[in-house]
Structure formats: structure tokens, C-alpha cells
Amino acid sequence: MQTIAQQITNIIEESLTDMGFELVLVKFKGVSPKVVEVLIDSLNGNKISIEDCTNVSRTISAILDVEDLIEEAYSLEVSSSGIERTLVKFENYNRFLGREVKIKLKELLNGKTLYPR
């Protein structure tokens, strides 16, 4: 069974792509107050503006209202993935190939969890 975040991803991703955005990540916090957090990036490399976030938020809100996945009231937060974004999809690694990254591991590797360069 899919989580709420996965279900939301499935129903909004195509619409965001059509709008020119990559859906980077969806998080759902199911405790009161419930929060749907959506991180986006531009497919064409442009910076994400507040207007972009507003338009995406309106689109997602309309879709979620129709699909009725979340019982009770919730807050919807849409933002840019930012410069320190987490790479969560395989395609992201190719997109940022050749750029400097800081890698933070969950487990020790050679006695370290942080590799700044």
C-alpha cells in the first residue's frame, strides 16, 4: 500500500511537469496540524519565484480537493528545493554531474559521515 506522500506524488507529478516544473519531493506530516510539503525545481533551469510557488500551490490544492486523499484540514507548503537540495531521484545525479557536492552519509564510511568535497 502506498503512503499518502506517494499517492500525492502520483496524482500531481504530471500536472507539474506540464507546468514546467520537476516534482522533487513530497512529504506528508500526518500529525495535527497535517502538512503537505512539496519541493519543486524548474525543468528549464530558471530560478523558482514566489509566483511559481503560488501557481503550483493553487494547482496542487485543486487536484487534492478533487481527489480527497487527506481527511480533515491540512496545510500545503510549496517551495523551491533550494541550493542545498537533497538528491532523491536517480535523474538528479546526471543533472548535477560535474558540480561540487557535499555528501552526508547515514552510516560511517572510513570513519566519516561527511565528505565536503
Curated annotation (Swiss-Prot):
This is Ribosome maturation factor RimP. Required for maturation of 30S ribosomal subunits. GO terms for cellular component: cytosol. Keywords: Cytoplasm, Ribosome biogenesis. Belongs to the RimP family. It comes from Rickettsia prowazekii (strain Madrid E). Transmembrane segments: none annotated. HAMAP family: RimP (MF_01077). It is found in: Cytoplasm. Pfam families: RimP_N. InterPro entries: Ribosome_maturation_RimP (IPR003728), RimP_N (IPR028989), RimP_N_sf (IPR035956). One of its GO terms (biological process) is ribosomal small subunit assembly. It comes from the Bacteria.
